């Protein structure tokens, strides 16, 4: 049981570093409330789970192929830059926290989280480095069923983090003044653009190198 809990804590730790997913999830919570923020997080978690499956079934060589990495860097640049620009465009719009008008569908929100996480090559390197090494170490001492159980512990940790992020962002939405909410939305938008430009730089570097 203690080992399983340690994998849940590991999932929380893996989710905590600030990145494009966390920035976008905060923006979703501020603009659209808890459910949109959490569903966005579920979309991102689904992409994480997909990468875990790839590594679990030994497909890491495909993920690290130069063509795949270049494609993901450039696709990530497009997704993050577009999302960042849209976020900044909406900063000046009035924020009515009680109105559901103009909110995207849950399906679109889920897809947005999935794409942002899936198109993040840093996620691949992260999961290859962390989960790959954990998988190799755990496989020496445990059978396949236990590996699946401990891997699910990591996903539970990610799920808990997404839930906490959604609560935090929706709390900001309900308690903070509109000007401060606009400021937080602006910071989220700029963060997404910075990550987007970084991805674009890496994609061009990979393409030319």
From Swiss-Prot:
Its GO biological process annotations read:
amino acid transport
Annotated transmembrane regions: 1-21, 39-59, 62-82, 110-130, 147-167, 184-204
Keyword field contains Lipoprotein: no
Going by the UniProt record, its keywords in alphabetical order are:
Cell membrane, Membrane, Transmembrane, Transmembrane helix
Q: How does it sit in the membrane?
A: Multi-pass membrane protein
Magnesium is among the record's keywords: no
Compartment(s): Cell membrane
What Gene Ontology molecular function terms does this protein carry? amino acid transmembrane transporter activity
User: What does the entry list under GO cellular component?
Assistant: plasma membrane
Family as reported in the entry's similarity comment: Belongs to the Rht family.
Listed PANTHER family: AMINO ACID EFFLUX PROTEIN YCGF-RELATED, ARGININE EXPORTER PROTEIN ARGO
What is the protein name stated in its UniProt record? Putative amino acid efflux protein YcgF
Originating species:
Bacillus subtilis (strain 168)
Which gene specifies this protein's sequence?
A: ycgF
């Amino acid at each position: 049981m203690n080992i399983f809990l340690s994998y849940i804590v590991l999932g929380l730790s893996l989710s905590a570093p600030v990145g494009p997913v966390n920035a976008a999830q905060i923006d979703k919570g501020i603009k659209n409330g808890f459910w949109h923020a959490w569903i966005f997080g579920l979309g991102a978690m689904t992409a994480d789970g997909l990468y875990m499956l790839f590594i679990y079934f030994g497909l890491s060589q495909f993920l690290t192929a130069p063509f795949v990495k270049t494609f993901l860097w450039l696709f990530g640049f497009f997704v993050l830059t577009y999302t960042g620009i849209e976020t900044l465009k909406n900063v000046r719009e009035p924020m009515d926290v009680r109105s559901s008008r103009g909110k995207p569908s849950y399906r679109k929100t889920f897809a947005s989280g999935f794409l942002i996480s899936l198109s993040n090559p840093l996620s691949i390197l992260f999961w290859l480095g962390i989960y790959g090494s954990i998988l190799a170490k755990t496989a020496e001492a445990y059978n396949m069923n236990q590996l699946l159980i401990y891997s699910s512990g990591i996903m539970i940790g990610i799920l808990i983090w997404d839930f906490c992020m959604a609560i935090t962002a929706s709390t900001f939405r309900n308690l903070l003044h509109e000007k401060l909410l606009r400021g937080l939305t602006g910071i989220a938008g700029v963060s997404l653009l910075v990550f987007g430009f970084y991805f674009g730089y890496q994609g061009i570097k990979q393409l030319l190198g």
